[in-house]
Amino acid sequence: MQLILLQKVTNLGNLGDLVDVKPGYGRNFLVPQGKAVPATESNKAEFEAKRADYEAKAQAIHADADARKAKLEGASVTIAANASTEGKLYGSVGAREIADAFTAAGLELNKSEVILGEGAFRNIGEYDVLVHLHADVETTVKVVVEAEKA
């Protein structure tokens, strides 16, 4: 299935690229999310006519991601969780808890932007977490998981 990308998509292409993808990926993800349109002649002509608008929108999104990166750079948050005396958590601290903690601290962060390479944290300690704000914008934040005070 051939598509025209309306924004940069990680591991696929940039704005305006003509890409071949599997039909399910295009039909169920890229097109409904507004990231691409089918590569018909009319869509190609319409895209070329509106190319400047799409590029301006992409620049604005990238600038917003850069501004958020500047706020998050070097940020740290502490999460208290129920833990045993050995330091093992009775549950886990995942992307949702991390995003909620940063949002509560005044730094907006979505669950989908938090990348936990090795899965949720199951022990108390200090962790570096990758935050993927845009296809080109990533930063690292510090998360401290500590035992709840009884």
From Swiss-Prot:
One example of a Gene Ontology biological process annotation: translation
Pfam families: Ribosomal_L9_C, Ribosomal_L9_N
Function, as annotated: Binds to the 23S rRNA.
Entry similarity comment: Belongs to the bacterial ribosomal protein bL9 family.
Protein name: Large ribosomal subunit protein bL9
Gene Ontology cellular component annotations, sorted alphabetically: ribonucleoprotein complex; ribosome
GO terms, molecular function: rRNA binding; structural constituent of ribosome
InterPro entries, per database record: Ribosomal_bL9 (IPR000244), Ribosomal_bL9/RNase_H1_N (IPR009027), Ribosomal_bL9_bac/chp (IPR020594), Ribosomal_bL9_C (IPR020069), Ribosomal_bL9_C_sf (IPR036791), Ribosomal_bL9_N (IPR020070), Ribosomal_bL9_N_sf (IPR036935)
The organism's place on the tree of life at top rank: Bacteria
Record keywords: Ribonucleoprotein, Ribosomal protein, RNA-binding, rRNA-binding
